[in-house]
UniProtKB/Swiss-Prot annotation:
Belongs to the chaperonin (HSP60) family. Its EC number is 5.6.1.7. The keyword Protein biosynthesis does not apply. Its main location: cytoplasm. Keywords: ATP-binding, Chaperone, Cytoplasm, Isomerase, Nucleotide-binding. Forms a cylinder of 14 subunits composed of two heptameric rings stacked back-to-back. Interacts with the co-chaperonin GroES. It comes from Albidiferax ferrireducens (strain ATCC BAA-621 / DSM 15236 / T118) (Rhodoferax ferrireducens). Together with its co-chaperonin GroES, plays an essential role in assisting protein folding. The GroEL-GroES system forms a nano-cage that allows encapsulation of the non-native substrate proteins and provides a physical environment optimized to promote and accelerate protein folding. The gene is groEL1. It catalyses: ATP + H2O + a folded polypeptide = ADP + phosphate + an unfolded polypeptide. It is found in: Cytoplasm. GO terms for biological process: protein refolding. ATP binds at residues 30-33, 51, 87-91, 415, 479-481, 495. This is Chaperonin GroEL 1.
Amino acid sequence: MAAKDVIFGGEARARMVEGVNILANAVKVTLGPKGRNVVLDRSFGAPTVTKDGVSVAKEIELKDKLQNMGAQMVKEVASKTSDIAGDGTTTATVLAQAIVHEGMKYVTAGMNPMDLKRGIDKAVHALIVELKKASKATTTSKEIAQVGSISANSDEAIGKIIADAMDKVGKEGVITVEDGKSLDSELDVVEGMQFDRGYLSPYFINNPEKQAALLDNPFVLLYDKKISNIRDLLPTLEQVAKSGRPLLIISEDVEGEALATLVVNTIRGILKVVAVKAPGFGDRRKAMLEDIAILTGGKVIAEEVGMSLEKVTLADLGSAKRIEVGKENTIIIDGAGAAADIEARVKQVRVQIEEATSDYDREKLQERVAKLAGGVAVIKVGAATEVEMKEKKARVEDALHATRAAVEEGIVAGGGVALLRAKQAVGTLKGANADQDAGIKLVMKAIEAPLREIVYNAGGEASVVVNAVMAGKGNYGFNAANDTYGDMIEMGILDPTKVTRTALQNAASVASLMLTTECMVSESPKDDSAAGMGGMGGGDMGGMGGMGGMGM
């Protein structure tokens, strides 16, 4: 095991704070409407330009081990805030730096760090209660658009697209972000349920312009095994042919003579049929087949429940108003399932979401809910260059998270004002002793930091603005975009309550851990200078020897 350095007390904390400051100073230049960009070097490809706090934080690794530990702890603040609320990463970093900066003064002055921590916790708890009281529910699509545009660094077009997407697919719908093909961002809404499997044979195509198979008012057969023998399918095909309606077959696979027979029947016009593979794998495939069954009002034909293909009746088949099958996707529009059954299924999947342990599972389950409940909206981000596209896409994703957070917990005045109002509402808070009082006091001072940084980035005088805002009431604050004062919510400067709350909680949590640090252990740097040169051997390399007469 490598040798370790063990550093105690003030020296350890001082080095850690240096790391915190390096990271926080790099992140906080991006805060506010007049925040600047940070350019990140890439080992290959063009450098990335970003105004997203967490992207900057993730890039930073410091050479000094102790400084790096400080930086990594603050990085945790940014990434945790990003995970939970999806935005507010820069605010969280600025708050953490401010709490550490204020707190270190008290620790150095000899106050008890544990009591300081208790004071900090008490103050944060009181502030969050006030934030929740001040929170206002987000209902109109105008408010949603405002939240989106603030989070996308005052880009109104992005805010509007997100609000439109939420209108179309509802609060529960899935909204995904993809690279667009044009210069402008556009919104594409898929009504109904879409899954990523296309036709098994191009001979099923009946609409050459769209390169798709369109089925109107079709039956849907759901089977969880492979179909290779056409004899199993014949009874179903005969019944469907009599009814004169088309048929979509969703099964693990259709191969060999079964597929050939279906293709021949389709080409001859005897029966309009399309076969696709079932979406997903393993247990997820079964669950998704069940979802489709509930959506279309059919049953999954599975041997486990004693059903077989030969005995299928029309009552076992699902149906839908319309189905579009492309090369890679199938869309089921307006399935015939009962609304109550779909509702019950959505509830069931929601319970699974709450119990899910991995992010991947949770994401997949949320997709299933959206496919059952609303629909899917795709925001295609347009930009002139690859670099701009990446930067814009990151902002759209941020804005999307922020709007979701706003719908969930409501909004408060933006621009750092909500924290100052919460501070005023808390008034005088007392701890159990003088050291706890100091902890409360330092939080109350530190929560001015986001507003100070916004003003500083806009080239203003922070103290003047803070005093002016503190003299006002309610949503009165400073709009750094055009250097005016007024009602923040009317000016459209809002933050989701969840974002502000999460930023404060995470910042205080990590900052108080740093204040209560007394010892740091890191690997000793290896001394390379002596070892590097070793073993060249025989110092003199010997002459080159004469070139010999070249006989010109």
